[in-house]
């Protein structure tokens, strides 16, 4: 049984649209594979360290008090298809519910086209 089986992964409807646009526009055919690798890494760190490492993702500050779960942003996303290592420029925001072991991916974007995450979508 894989460690991933203990966790649920869900996405915001707009996340799926953005994900597909990045595959087509940026000609990044490995994005699906890279995203799966990110999921494995997040679960691995969570299982081994009981936290997310700050060199991969940071907690997002300044959110509404309505937000029930902590929100994180992955800043060092490795994309094989772009050949820049962790400096691909992609950002991924997600919420994590420890009680439900649920990752909810909210947004994916390129930092060169959009400098900051959409806090309205997270709220």
Language-model region placement:
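Basic, Lys/Arg-enriched alpha-helical interface segments
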Residues: 1-86, 99-102, 110-123
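Short glycine-/small-residue motifs
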Residues: 105
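Short, low-complexity Ser/Thr-rich regulatory SLiMs
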Residues: 94-98
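Short, surface-exposed coil-to-beta transition loops
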Residues: 86-92
């Amino acid at each position: 049984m894989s460690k991933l089986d203990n966790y649920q992964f869900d996405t915001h409807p707009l996340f799926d649209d953005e994900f597909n646009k990045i595959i087509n526009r940026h000609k990044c055919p490995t994005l699906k594979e890279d995203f799966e690798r990110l999921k494995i890494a997040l679960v691995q760190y969570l299982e081994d360290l009981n936290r997310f490492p700050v060199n991969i993702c940071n907690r997002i500050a300044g959110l509404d008090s309505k937000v029930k779960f902590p929100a994180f942003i992955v800043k060092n996303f490795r994309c094989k298809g772009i050949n820049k290592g962790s400096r691909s420029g992609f950002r991924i925001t997600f919420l994590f519910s420890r009680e439900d072991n649920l990752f909810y991916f909210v947004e994916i974007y390129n930092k060169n086209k959009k400098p900051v995450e959409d806090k309205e979508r997270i709220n």
